[in-house]
Each structure stands twice: as structure tokens, then as C-alpha cells.
Amino acid sequence: MSKKKPLSQGQLRRMRANHEKRLNRDSGDKNTPELQDSSLGPEQSGTVISRFGQHADIETEDGHIVRCNIRRTITSLVTGDKVIVRLAIESQANSGIAGIVEAVHPRHSSLSRPDLYDGVKIIASNIDQILIVSSVLPSFTTQIIDRYLVAAEDTDIPPIIILNKIDLLTPEEAPAIEEALKRYQDIGYPVYKVSSKLGEGLETIKALLKDKVSVFAGQSGVGKSSLVNALLPEAELLVGDVSDNSGLGQHTTTTAKLLHLPSGGDLIDSPGVREFALWHLPAQRVGWCFIEFRDFLGGCKFRDCKHGDDPGCALKAAVDAGKISEDRFNNYHRIIASLDEQRHARQFRAQSDE
């Protein structure tokens, strides 16, 4: 069987355009009337609290939350965006739509993840810090932490590592987990341990969140929603159990939502993901996002060094000298190895949808 030729850039653009048309057609509410300009009031500022297809919940200047249509000229709107809205002079009670989003202010930061169709998809914006939540159950893994750290470094959003469910930590597991967390502290990442169930460490987390816009990131089952509920009980987010069969958490939060904390600051709770794909990043960028590698990058004997068993590799020499952790070095190679696999999966998906 002959191998399929890679898709051209033109084919990829047409595929994405057709996909966007399908999304707009499927998500458009034919029963929702368009708001006419004559029925709209003056422009005012607002913040996107949550996005639902072609609608968004907007917090207005006076603190009210209203559901608005989104102008078709707006190609990207996510939770955390600062926007210009116009509210309907007379509320359309039957539709539940109270206004329209006219424009989006420039973002000072954004958190993105790769999308099989659209390349890179922004999932939240105007974020001051990322709280990377890991836990004892599902089993603690540094691979997921390192993927989120790469994403944070790539977007230049300061990360904080949170270990949740420490009430489940056994004496047998504790030494290895403590050693792994210390490696992150040694290279400059702040690490905190909490138990959302027992309330341990929550006051420290509240202080970290004060006067900032934060986002919780982490795989399903690590207790992000439970942690949010402990910090803000009135949020009433759904909480899922850990699957008995797989040990993986059930997806609970269904859409990113911005929440106000009584102690000050905002929190964006975003849907959990089982793996944070990074195939949109070139290998050189991934290496730069491992912050302890930076002093050694460019010091290899050969410019095309793969940082494996290549002779004269500065990174490998740093690992051997104890200047770079072997675990982090191995996770770097796991990420690099996954890049081609994920790119191939995207291309296969694209070809299948033709």
C-alpha cells in the first residue's frame, strides 16, 4: 500500500476552514434571534466568565453576569478575556440573551494547548500564575508535572506546583515523592502540599491566590474541583471519583469558568486533561523550557546534538555531574519522543476527516 503524501498547507487551511464552518453550523442556535444594533445600549467593559459555543457569560462593570451573543467577527473568545459589550435595552426573556460581545481587548497572557484541527487552541487568558496540581492518587508522576511546566514556561506564566491529597500519602510512598518535589524546589519552582479533604495547607493557597488571576492545571482525578470547592464552597463544582478500573479520575468540570475568591483574586477552573500534548513546540523550544538546561544549551560539541549519547553533549555531561536531575532529563526525552507521535496522530486525523 502506497504511503499517503503529507497534506499541503493549502489543504490544511481548507480543512480547518471547513471544520470551523461545521462548528458554527452545529453550535448556532436557530431559535435565538439576532440582536439588532437599534436595540442595544452603549458600549461597556466586561470580563468573560465562561464560554458556551456561540454564547458567553459576561460579568459587566456593575458586577452582574449576563449571557451574550458573540459577534461573528470575533474568532477567539475564552474565559478571562476582557471585552467590550453592549446590552439589550429591553431584555429578550424568551432567548435569555441580554447583549452582544463587540470586541476583545489584547491579552497580556494566554494558556494554550494543541488541537487536532486548529493547531493551537487558547483555553484561558490574562492569567498571572498557573497552579499545577498533582496528587498521591492517581499515582504521582513527574511526567505530567514536567509537561505543564513546559507549557507554563512557553507562555511565560509563572508556575506553582501543588501536591494534593497528602492525607493519602503512605510512609512507603513519602520518601520518593518528597525527593521528587525537592528537585523542583532546587531549580526554583515553589512547591506546596495540601489536603482539600482535611483543609491542610488551604490558608497558604488562599494567600497565593490573593489579588491574582490563577488557573489550576492537572490531569483528571488530582482533585482540582475538590480543591476549588474547599477554597470556595459556594462554587459547587462537580466532583468526580477516581475510576476503580483505571485509577484515572473522571472528567468533572465541563467548561472553563472564572470564579471570584472572597479573600481576593480570581480563579479559572478549566477542564482536566489526561495528557498535556506539546507537539506544537519545536524540540529546541522544549529544551529551553526546562529551565535548568539553559546554562548548558549551546555548549554541545555538535550543533545538531540530540542530547542523548552524542559525543560532547553538554546536557548529558551536566546530568553525569549531578547538575541536572536524571528524572527531568528522561522526561525531556519522553516529551521529545512523543512530539512526532502526536504530530502523526494529528495528520492521520486530518486525513481521515477529508
Curated annotation (Swiss-Prot):
<dbReference type="GO" id="GO:0003924">
    <property type="term" value="F:GTPase activity"/>
</dbReference>
<feature type="compositionally biased region" description="Polar residues">
    <location>
        <begin position="33"/>
        <end position="46"/>
    </location>
</feature>
<feature type="binding site">
    <location>
        <position position="313"/>
    </location>
    <ligand>
        <name>Zn(2+)</name>
    </ligand>
</feature>
<feature type="binding site">
    <location>
        <position position="307"/>
    </location>
    <ligand>
        <name>Zn(2+)</name>
    </ligand>
</feature>
<dbReference type="InterPro" id="IPR027417">
    <property type="entry name" value="P-loop_NTPase"/>
</dbReference>
<dbReference type="InterPro" id="IPR012340">
    <property type="entry name" value="NA-bd_OB-fold"/>
</dbReference>
<dbReference type="GO" id="GO:0005737">
    <property type="term" value="C:cytoplasm"/>
</dbReference>
<keyword id="KW-0690">Ribosome biogenesis</keyword>
<keyword id="KW-0479">Metal-binding</keyword>
<keyword id="KW-0699">rRNA-binding</keyword>
<protein>
    <recommendedName>
        <fullName>Small ribosomal subunit biogenesis GTPase RsgA</fullName>
        <ecNumber>3.6.1.-</ecNumber>
    </recommendedName>
</protein>
<keyword id="KW-0547">Nucleotide-binding</keyword>
<dbReference type="Pfam" id="PF03193">
    <property type="entry name" value="RsgA_GTPase"/>
</dbReference>
<keyword id="KW-0963">Cytoplasm</keyword>
<keyword id="KW-0342">GTP-binding</keyword>
<dbReference type="InterPro" id="IPR030378">
    <property type="entry name" value="G_CP_dom"/>
</dbReference>
<feature type="binding site">
    <location>
        <position position="300"/>
    </location>
    <ligand>
        <name>Zn(2+)</name>
    </ligand>
</feature>
<keyword id="KW-0862">Zinc</keyword>
<feature type="binding site">
    <location>
        <begin position="218"/>
        <end position="226"/>
    </location>
    <ligand>
        <name>GTP</name>
    </ligand>
</feature>
<dbReference type="GO" id="GO:0046872">
    <property type="term" value="F:metal ion binding"/>
</dbReference>
<comment type="subunit">
    <text>Monomer. Associates with 30S ribosomal subunit, binds 16S rRNA.</text>
</comment>
<feature type="region of interest" description="Disordered">
    <location>
        <begin position="1"/>
        <end position="46"/>
    </location>
</feature>
<feature type="domain" description="CP-type G">
    <location>
        <begin position="108"/>
        <end position="276"/>
    </location>
</feature>
<dbReference type="GO" id="GO:0042274">
    <property type="term" value="P:ribosomal small subunit biogenesis"/>
</dbReference>
<feature type="compositionally biased region" description="Basic and acidic residues">
    <location>
        <begin position="17"/>
        <end position="32"/>
    </location>
</feature>
<dbReference type="GO" id="GO:0005525">
    <property type="term" value="F:GTP binding"/>
</dbReference>
<dbReference type="InterPro" id="IPR004881">
    <property type="entry name" value="Ribosome_biogen_GTPase_RsgA"/>
</dbReference>
<comment type="similarity">
    <text>Belongs to the TRAFAC class YlqF/YawG GTPase family. RsgA subfamily.</text>
</comment>
<comment type="function">
    <text>One of several proteins that assist in the late maturation steps of the functional core of the 30S ribosomal subunit. Helps release RbfA from mature subunits. May play a role in the assembly of ribosomal proteins into the subunit. Circularly permuted GTPase that catalyzes slow GTP hydrolysis, GTPase activity is stimulated by the 30S ribosomal subunit.</text>
</comment>
<feature type="binding site">
    <location>
        <begin position="164"/>
        <end position="167"/>
    </location>
    <ligand>
        <name>GTP</name>
    </ligand>
</feature>
<keyword id="KW-0694">RNA-binding</keyword>
<feature type="binding site">
    <location>
        <position position="305"/>
    </location>
    <ligand>
        <name>Zn(2+)</name>
    </ligand>
</feature>
<dbReference type="GO" id="GO:0019843">
    <property type="term" value="F:rRNA binding"/>
</dbReference>
<keyword id="KW-0378">Hydrolase</keyword>
<dbReference type="InterPro" id="IPR010914">
    <property type="entry name" value="RsgA_GTPase_dom"/>
</dbReference>
